[in-house]
Structure formats: structure tokens, C-alpha cells
Amino acid sequence: MTFSLELSEEQQELRDWVHGFAEQTIRPAAREWDEREETPWPIIQEAAKIGLYGFETLATFWADDTGLSLPIANEELFWGDGGIGMAIFGTTLAVAGIFAAGTPDQLAEWVPQCYGDVDDPKVAAFCSSEPGAGSDVSAMRTRAVYDEAKDEWVLNGQKAWATNGGIANVHVVQAVVDPELGSRGQAAFVVPPGTKGLESPSKIKKHGLRASHTADVFLDDVRVPGSCLLGGKEKLDERLARSREGTKASSQAAMKTFELSRPAVGAQAVGIARAAYETALEYAQQRETFGRPIIENQSIAFTLADMRMEIDAARLLVWRAAWLGRNGGFTAGEGSMSKLKAGRVATWATERAIQILGGNGYTREFPVERMHRDAKIYDIFEGTEQIQQLVVARAISGKHIA
């Protein structure tokens, strides 16, 4: 398939549909839910009612051979608000984990339970990071031990910074099954609703994305059926055997999930950056000093020109990465490039927007201060800025740069 910048009619309709929901439903509620620092369940339910939140829509996104539907939708969703956008999108991280490693039967069983239904929507959590294992996935300490007599896996450990952790209907947990193999000795498990031993005492108070629930998750002798091992035990045993023999094994589920999500996450940052740019542009056209709109001053106009240029460049990198992910794969760390660039642009553009608004930009009466707080996380999660640079550096050099 040829890469094209011309959106299909269906993609344009998708963009307009999500934009309409973001403009009419998300934006008017953004400040309230940011200040409440609570999951916006009424908005999630509204998204479910129109079909925006649910597996059917996500499946439609993933069925797009161009790979662009999810980034297009994400940009509009997060243009509405980063925190509410993540409250709606967060479940996708867990679903991506199930898709990366699960069997068709597991997908059919667990993905619908991640979303619930229109009358009773649910959320799901992907639990990979730990207090001592963020960027360094090989440092993971959560263990999964197989109880052959009962055909159950017993999970013990602590997960950190889990989106929807504790409030999720379904938790997808990454754990070590063979410590001697490092990151190659890991597997992913579904923890069903109501499983004993999974606790999340409190949520984490965050700098930004406050409408999205983030928490540590504790696993104390959590027992799950053997069928909850994503991919199944036979496949796991084969992979572990290849690793012990020193032959190449496929990437673990956590890394597959990150690979699937980076262009989509980059699109979120583009949406936040665009929202800040548009706010600053409108303000600069209306705000007058010294008898004229401030946009007529070169310093302001040039800043806005740079903002528009950088946002468009970031979007193009995101679209290229999304397309490559579906058509041939990455050769030079393009997925990491897209997220790295988009994250940098988001933090820079939101800061510039505050500067253009001056004192008003520093207050909560205007949305750019919230956008700035929301943007910072894109330099950190789903792979820090430095890890993204490392991925690209290794890809272009062919060397294992530490």
C-alpha cells in the first residue's frame, strides 16, 4: 500500500465525528474534571453511547490498513482534553496487551470485558512498570509461579503508575516467569474481575492528566486460572526453551504493546499541542496592546508560525510511523521518532502558548496552563525521551548503545 497524506472519506468522517464529541462534550467539562481529579464516568458513558468507547470502534480503527485511523481519532480526542482523553483511551493500553500476546479465544473472552457495555461501561489497566523497573523492563520483580496441580498461576509483586489501576474491571499484568532469562523470561496475564489479592489502596496525585486515574497495584498471592496466561502455556514453554538455547525469541508482550502504541501516543501529544496553538492564535488575534492586536508583533507572529510548523511536522512523523507499523515495519526507530518529536513539540508549544497569553496563561481561567501540565507526561511515559533516543540510535547504528 502506498503512503498517502490524502485522507479517505471514511477517515475524514471519523476525524469530524471525534472532533464534534471533543468540542461539544469533552471541552466544556475539562476544567471541572481536572480540578476534581476523578475519573469522568459520565463522559465515558456518553462516549460509549455514541460508539466511541468500545471494542467495535477500536476494531474498526485497527482494521484500517493505512494505520491512520487511531492516530486521527486520538489527535481529536486529546485536542478536547488530555485528562479526559486518557480516561477514554487508557483501556486501549490493556487491550493492546491482549492483542499483542493473546489467542483468538482470549481476545473474544477478555476484550469485551475491558469495555463493559453502554449501560455499565468498564475500564481496563495494563500493568507493566514497577517502582524499580520503569524504562528498564528487565529489572521487573513481579513473579508468576505455575501451580501445576491446580493449573493456576500465582502472582506476587507491585506495579506502579498503572492507568486505571485498581478501578479496572480487567488488569493485564506483566510478570517474570523465569528470572534467569531477564526480559525474555516474562509473560502477560489477565487478572479477572474480583480476583482476591489484587489491591490498590489509593490513586496517585499527578501534575497533569488529572482526570485519568493512576495508581500502584499490589499483587499478594493472586491466583488466576492457567487460561489467563496470554498466548497459553505451550507457546510460553516453547519461547522460554528457545531463549535458554540462545536462539532468538520474539519480543515480550510489554515491548510489543509499547511498539503498537507509540504512534498513537504521539498523536495524543499532537492533539494537545494543536489545542494550545489554536488557543494562543485566537488570543493573539483578539488581545490588543499599544493599539493593535499582539499578533501584529513579529515576535508573537513568528512564534505562532513556528508552533504551526512544528505541530505539522510532528503529525507527519506520527502518520508515517503509524503507516509503517501496518505496512512493512520500522527500520530506523520511526515509532520512537514520532513519539519523541510529538512529546517535545507538545511541551514546547504549550509553554509558548502560556507566554503568548501572558499572565492570563498562568491562570486556571484559561486552558493553556492545564494543557502544559498534561503535555509534560509525553516526555516520560510509554518510553522516556531518553529511551526513545536510545531506540533510534540503536536502529540507525546497528550497535547496542547503552
Where do the protein language model's features map onto the residues?
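Alpha-helical interface subdomain recognition
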Residues: 1-80, 84, 117, 121, ...
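FAD-binding core of FAD-dependent oxidoreductases
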Residues: 81-96, 118-129, 158-171
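N-terminal glycine-rich flavin-associated loop
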Residues: 85-107, 134-136, 146
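FAD-binding glycine-rich core of flavoenzymes that anchor FAD
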Residues: 100-130, 148-151
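Short Gly/Pro-enriched turn/cap motifs at secondary-structure boundaries
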Residues: 132-135, 161-164, 178-180, 206-213
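A short core secondary-structure module
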Residues: 152-200
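Flexible, small-/acidic-enriched active-site or ligand-binding loops
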Residues: 196-225, 229
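Long, acidic (Asp/Glu-rich), low-complexity accessory segments flanking structured domains
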Residues: 221-252
